[in-house]
UniProtKB/Swiss-Prot annotation:
The gene is yidC. The chain crosses the membrane at residues 350-370, 424-444, 461-481, 498-518. It comes from Neisseria gonorrhoeae (strain NCCP11945). One of its GO terms (molecular function) is membrane insertase activity. This is Membrane protein insertase YidC. It comes from the Bacteria. Belongs to the OXA1/ALB3/YidC family. Type 1 subfamily.
Length: 545
């Protein structure tokens, strides 16, 4: 069948792409001398802009944060409950400003002309080490009075949370009305997290959600184009009364929340202005400017915005802000992957183990598809039973392909066989496979989630390749249950396919391979039962419908 040939070709192409990516990863381009000089200048500029002062360390049960005392920037954020991708002996570091990469959260107050009112003036804190002992820990950074304004920046960390409240306390002693705005930014370079590959690649970059534009990704490449052209043409909403924005990467995110779920928007004094760009220092910035109500002489005011910097745990982020769960990158199949993960999550809540939840989900999906797949498998079983007659036709007509095809079509008609009926089971599984792939790949809930024995992380490949080998065995078993192709070349290809798919699945998440193994076992049981039933009917001389 042409479909089988196409499937085999597709599978081999996938393996070639995976193998090439693994053995010959795309090298990073070596900059030309002029480009290298420009890069060094840009790096020097970036280091000057982010020059560290005395660090302030904050430790809670979930994070260890490092705040730059002078600028008040959040320079480093370690997620203590998550292991590093490449080294399970170390915790995962989200923010950092070292030699490896730059990824920080910044905030400042601007005057009516858009200038930082504390430029060149540093904050100070009463101590350098803070540890969570109760429900919250507060870090107050105070700046000397400037132009009659007394400003404090206050970080509040909460127990068992990745939500950080960043607040400015302002006392206006200038003798005149102060018209200010607060600017909140996420700044990072374009480096990708460790573990990104051809089939394990997730979006990295700025995102924004607004009621006007819904969820939008703003790619680094679009921002590069804007920087080269000097225009601002990247597609995103620039003025909004509410929403959120920031940066995402595989499993993790950092976003400024303009309106907490069920709360008031910080844009109450006027629309917030969003600016996503590549800066002159080659760093990328996702920022929002929040206008403040006029502060009268002698009055005090405060403005606070929540920063969520942590894992993309659906049950958590969905309760922080409207549609924040859209930051979980399901690619272009969100419409299918999201409900699949919802069902998987419900099963996990009942069973308590993500691996067994995948097994039960597979059984449910198989049961839902049963009415459709059953007819197709019966067609395949009838094709298998008619194989001797097909071989007779082939021997009778030899090289006369036209007569051979006519005789085969007449046989299909007499035996009530649909020669394309066997394609349907695989076609039906393709959207499920793709949706479940993204549901498992994108969901941080499965990161470090064990199943049993050697499977200690369902989001990563089987370390000993046991599941892919089992999957190959089940695929070999299926080839003997299905009707043999009449074309010798196709027959050889169908025997090679199990090996091809098993190699491909070496690099897939163990949770996905588990789904495929269970699905194959159920398919084998179903096909075996149907084959036995049809063979029994033929042996008894009954008409097979």
């Amino acid at each position: 069948m042409d479909f089988k040939r196409l499937t085999a070709f597709f599978a081999i192409a996938l393996v070639i792409m995976i193998g090439w990516e693994k053995m010959f990863p795309t090298p990073k381009p070596v900059p030309a001398p002029q480009q290298a000089a420009q890069k060094q200048a840009a790096t020097a500029s970036a280091e000057a802009a982010l020059a560290p002062a005395t660090p302030i360390t904050v430790t809670t049960d979930t994070v260890q944060a490092v705040i730059d005392e002078k600028s008040g920037d959040l320079r480093r954020l370690t997620l203590l409950k998550y292991k590093a991708t490449g080294d399970e002996n170390k915790p995962f570091v989200l923010f950092g400003d070292g030699k490896e990469y730059t990824y920080v959260a910044q905030s400042e107050l601007l005057d009516a002309q858009g200038n930082n009112i504390l430029k060149g003036i540093g904050f100070s804190a009463p101590k350098k080490q803070y540890t969570l002992n109760g429900d919250t820990v507060e870090v107050r950074l105070s700046a000397p009075e400037t132009n009659g304004l007394k400003i404090d920046k206050v970080y509040t960390f909460t127990k068992d949370s990745y939500l950080v409240n960043v607040r400015f306390d302002i006392a206006n002693g200038s003798g005149q009305t102060a018209n200010l705005s607060a600017d909140y930014r996420i700044v990072r370079d374009h480096s990708e997290p460790e573990g990104q590959g051809y089939f394990t690649h997730s979006y990295v970059g700025p995102v924004v959600y607004t009621p006007e534009g819904n969820f939008q990704k703003v790619s680094f490449s679009d921002l590069d184009d804007d920087a080269k052209s000097g225009k601002s043409e990247a597609e995103y909403i620039r003025k909004t009364p509410t929403g959120w924005l920031g940066m995402i990467e595989h499993h993790f995110m950092s976003t400024w929340i303009l309106q907490p779920k069920g709360g008031q928007s910080v844009c109450a004094a006027g629309d917030c202005h969003i600016d996503i760009k590549r800066r002159s220092d080659k760093l990328y910035s996702a920022s929002v400017s929040v206008p403040l109500a006029a502060i009268q002489a002698g009055a005090k005011a405060e403005t606070a915005v929540n920063l969520y910097a942590g894992p993309q745990t659906t049950s958590v982020i969905a309760n922080i802000a409207d549609n924040l769960q859209l930051a979980k990158d399901y690619g272009k199949v969100h419409w299918f992957a999201s409900p699949l993960f919802w069902l998987l999550n419900q099963l996990h809540n009942i069973i308590g183990n993500w691996g067994w939840a995948i097994v039960v989900l597979t059984i449910i999906v198989k049961a839902v598809l049963y009415p459709l797949t059953n007819a197709s498998y019966r067609s395949m079983a009838k094709m298998r039973a008619a194989a001797p007659k097909l071989q007779t036709i082939k021997e009778k007509y030899g090289d006369d392909r036209m007569a051979q095809q006519q005789a085969m079509m007449q046989l299909y008609k007499d035996e009530k066989i649909n020669p394309l009926g066997g394609c349907l089971p695989m076609l039906l599984q393709i959207p499920v496979f793709i949706g479940l792939y993204w549901a498992l790949f994108a969901s941080v809930e499965l990161r470090q989630a064990p199943w049993l024995g050697w499977i200690t992380d369902l989001s990563r490949a089987d370390p000993y390749y046991i599941l892919p080998i089992i999957m190959a065995a089940t695929m070999f078993a299926q080839t003997y249950l299905n009707p043999p192709p009449t074309d010798p070349m196709q027959a050889k290809m169908m025997k090679i396919m199990p090996l091809v798919f098993s190699v491909m699945f070496f690099f897939f998440p163990a949770g996905l391979v588990l789904y495929w193994v269970v699905n194959n076992l159920l398919t084998i049981a179903q096909q075996w039962h149907i084959n036995r039933s049809i063979e029994k009917q033929r042996a008894q001389g009954e008409v097979v419908s």
